[in-house]
Amino acid sequence: MLDLKRIRTDFDTVAAKLKNRGVSEDTLTHLKELDEKRRTLLVQSEELKAERNIASAAIAQAKRQKEDATQQIADMQKVSADIKTIDNQLVAIDQQVTDIITVLPNTPHDSVPVGADEEDNVEIRRWGTPRDFNFEVKAHWDLGEDLDILDWERGAKVTGARFLFYKNLGARLERALYNFMLDEHIKEGYQEIITPYMVNHDSMFGTGQYPKFKEDTFELADTNFVLIPTAEVPLTNYYRGEILDGKELPIYFTAMSPSFRSEAGSAGRDTRGLIRLHQFHKVEMVKFAKPEESYQELEKMTANAENILQKLGLPYRVISLCTGDMGFSAAKTYDLEVWIPAQNTYREISSCSNTEDFQARRAQIRYRDEADGKVKLLHTLNGSGLAVGRTVAAILENYQNEDGSVTIPEVLRPYMGGETVISPK
């Protein structure tokens, strides 16, 4: 959530930044007008309360002196009625301010490229060279069925579209991947966490999914619970409402969890395969950092995600998302896109973001600065390290052989009991 004081004192800068994120200046102007009216009413309310206190004292004195206080009482009742009217106005204005400010996206960092959509994203670097196949490559969904390791037909029967069963070495490959990813992140100083897979609405507000993106989630009927769309939500909210010791920062968390997404608005996109599912495993990275260190931590987090792809030998590129393509809470985002041979393109496999103090303000996560003893908002960061199903897709396609088998990447073999290849039955 944005700082209302910042909008008030630096309106033009905030308006220009949010314009690049698709927010009309009229929206901010209306917010500013509401804020000004609110502040005026607060002053009036305080003045009337002071007047009421004086009147109350005068009434008390008149009664002590056995004097008639009828007029003073009538005057005080009128003042009290005026205060109640103003307070009701303030409640209504506060709700309007909340309705606007809670759906405003974060302001982009100055280094973020300005653009409307993914066409305006900027490639930063590439790693690895896509393999030159001397045979016709298969899509990962065909490989999965031919190898009897992925079953979409029964997934659809048991649940519905965008669900599947992992089987045999497919299930083992998925498990090997997330164990490998977690182990690599732990080496880099991340604390492993097993989170709840359901969170409450306050947690969804804290990380920015609510109220704007409720349609993208699965809520449990007649409860306050939501299935997590990412482990970012429980990990970030771990410290919601707390004040941390500045000497403890930065703090790194990592977790593997299922993620549940309704994929509203994705009809017709990636209807086959592992790219877009309603339920998938993802290894998440979350950091809590001091403001002056958060962009250095973003570079480190991105490198942690890249490390996984490099050790798996998967070609990828790093993209800096433009203002029009970033997520709601992000101030800056790097996407990692892995090479998918059957599609002859790179597809997103990780997204690493610095939200600055946007989530921390919503969730009230603060720290006491050891330098001056003041309590301040910290910065939160999150990143995929990696989306496991998409990594399976990338391995199946990049490591496929002409005979229909798939070679298991060397770093995963210790996690798979020494298996080296997945062969057709």
Curated annotation (Swiss-Prot):
Reactions accelerated catalytically: tRNA(Ser) + L-serine + ATP = L-seryl-tRNA(Ser) + AMP + diphosphate + H(+); tRNA(Sec) + L-serine + ATP = L-seryl-tRNA(Sec) + AMP + diphosphate + H(+)
Gene that produces this protein: serS
Major subcellular site: cytoplasm
Species: Streptococcus pyogenes serotype M12 (strain MGAS2096)
Localisation per UniProt entry: Cytoplasm
Stored CDD domains: SerRS_core
Gene3D superfamilies: Bira Bifunctional Protein, Domain 2 (3.30.930.10), Serine-tRNA synthetase, tRNA binding domain (1.10.287.40)
Keyword Transferase: no
The name this protein goes by in its record: Serine--tRNA ligase
NCBIfam families: serS (TIGR00414)
GO MF term set: ATP binding; catalytic activity, acting on a protein; serine-tRNA ligase activity; transferase activity
Function field: Catalyzes the attachment of serine to tRNA(Ser). Is also able to aminoacylate tRNA(Sec) with serine, to form the misacylated tRNA L-seryl-tRNA(Sec), which will be further converted into selenocysteinyl-tRNA(Sec).
GO CC, alphabetical: cytoplasm
Sorted UniProt keywords: Aminoacyl-tRNA synthetase, ATP-binding, Cytoplasm, Ligase, Nucleotide-binding, Protein biosynthesis
Free-text note on domains in this protein's UniProt record: Consists of two distinct domains, a catalytic core and a N-terminal extension that is involved in tRNA binding.
